A protein has these predicted regions:
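Sec-dependent bacterial lipoprotein signal peptides
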Residues: 1-19
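Cross-family detector of peptidyl-prolyl cis-trans isomerase
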Residues: 19-182
């Protein structure tokens, strides 16, 4: 009987501890924030370099008057129409465009890109182009200069546009179809 008590005591203690609720362990974080700080500093330098390069291009291009958008890209009207309607969310626009690098080398021709149909703010396209189209009227041809963060960003387009590459888009807005409520 004496040998039964220790076994019973061990069994009861195992039973009691196994029935208790398990406590979640917190992950141990050793992050000092240096990676984020370095990344922020690197992006600030990149943005400043792009801004300097874009400003040089704008200064040399005296044929056009450039405007800076609230979204951080530049644009100039190569052909300004007399229309007064801007596309708004839900409208369907048809446009042609070509993409060059900052030095005028063609990355994608208008023939490669073909005419595009875009549902304003309802489809996913490059952020600069999404915002730029809303500044255009039917018949406008606009030259947009997009810093990399408004273009294809860190990843590029995985084809011809490289990492953190600023680009120039020549866009012609052919048509705006206003969405009609049903």
């Amino acid at each position: 009987m004496n040998s039964f008590k220790p076994i019973l005591l061990v069994a009861v203690s195992i039973f009691i501890t196994s029935c208790s609720e398990k406590q979640a362990r917190q992950p141990i974080s050793h992050s000092s924030g240096t990676f984020m700080k370095e990344s922020i500093d690197r992006n600030k330098k990149l943005n400043e370099q792009e801004k300097i390069a874009i400003n040089k291009i704008i200064q040399k291009d005296t044929a056009f008057i450039y405007n800076r958008s609230e979204k951080g890209f530049w644009y100039a009207y190569e052909n300004k129409s007399t229309e007064n309607v801007f596309p708004v969310k839900g409208d369907v626009v048809n446009f042609d465009y070509e993409i060059t690098d900052l030095y005028g080398n063609t990355i994608y021709s208008a023939e490669e890109l073909k005419p595009q149909t875009y549902y304003v703010d309802k489809q996913n396209i490059m952020s600069g182009l999404r915002n730029g189209i809303k500044l255009m009227h039917k018949g406008d041809k606009v030259k947009f200069i997009f810093p990399s963060q408004s273009a294809y960003g860190y990843h590029g387009d995985d084809k011809k546009i490289g990492t953190n590459q600023p680009i120039i888009c020549h866009v012609t807005l052919n048509e705006i179809k206003t969405e009609t409520p049903e």
